[in-house]
Regions:
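Transmembrane beta-strand segments that form the barrel wall of outer-membrane beta-barrel proteins
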Residues: 34-40, 63-74, 94-102, 109-111, ...
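Short glycine/proline- and aromatic-enriched beta-strand/turn motifs that initiate or cap beta-hairpins
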Residues: 22-73
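Cleavable N-terminal export/targeting peptides
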Residues: 1-29
Length: 240
């Protein structure tokens, strides 16, 4: 389940690639990247303890963005394939993402089993406002289709909201602070509780310099007050 991760990755890589460019070329709408992370954290939820690889390809033109992204733990404990489309106009972005978790065996996660009662897909709609004069972002998202079900098989429409503040000290030294909460009983609290803060995140991003080459890196402290857990992760980013 990867939305903001992809946006951060593209931002870090675009900065690094610009610094490494030796001549001005027409920018391609296609991109490819790879993130290596010490563990997979998303919206305050730990998806495993093993280092995880996130490959991504994307297409971006005139405000339209499409991507395919994967998440693979090196110990084989987690696999994920995400597809998404979004459109940005001025300060607003709306999009839909499909999250899919393949396993080596099993029938419920067959990719083309798309019946809402049986599918293994999780489909989410979201909207984001990113301020230009006010340095904030606000995201609201809801699972609208798929495996986000309660024990009775009913759609939970698990919803999440996040407010964040980015700050740049220099071109290669940035911090982002955010607070996120689930808005109803659902996925983020195992259908046990309504509104709760589930994600407090502080992420510092910089670049390691090797001559003319810059390697984007980040470090994150994550606190989930609802689960009473905290985590620390680091990531490296590569443009292909």
């Amino acid at each position: 389940m990867i939305i903001n991760r992809g946006k951060l990755l593209l931002l870090l890589l675009s900065t690094a690639m610009a610094a490494n460019a030796e001549e001005n070329l027409k920018e391609s709408p296609f991109s490819a990247s790879l993130e290596l992370s010490t563990k997979y954290m998303w919206r305050g939820i730990e998806y495993g303890t093993a280092p995880t690889v996130f490959p991504m390809i994307g297409y971006n033109t005139h405000g339209f963005n499409a991507f395919a992204m994967g998440g693979y733990a090196i110990d084989g404990s987690h696999q994920e394939v995400d597809l998404g489309v979004s459109y940005t106009a001025s300060e607003f972005t709306v999009g839909v993402s499909d999250y899919y978790y393949p396993s080596s065996v099993g029938e419920k996660d067959q990719y083309f089993k798309l019946n809402n009662r049986e599918t293994g897909h999780w489909v989410e709609a979201y909207a984001t406002w990113t301020g230009t004069k006010v340095p904030l972002w606000v995201t609201v998202s809801t699972y609208i289709f798929g495996a986000d079900k309660n024990v009775d098989g009913k759609q939970m429409y698990s919803s999440y909201a996040e407010v964040g503040y980015p700050h740049s000290f220099t071109e290669d030294n940035n911090i982002a602070l955010c607070v996120g909460a689930n808005l109803n009983k659902g996925f983020y609290t195992n259908n046990q509780s309504g509104f709760n803060v589930v994600n407090i995140n502080a992420k510092y991003s910089t670049a390691l310099k090797f001559g003319n080459f810059k390697l984007p890196v980040s470090a994150s402290y994550v606190l989930n007050p609802y689960n009473n857990k905290s985590y620390f992760t680091m990531s490296l980013y590569f443009g292909l």
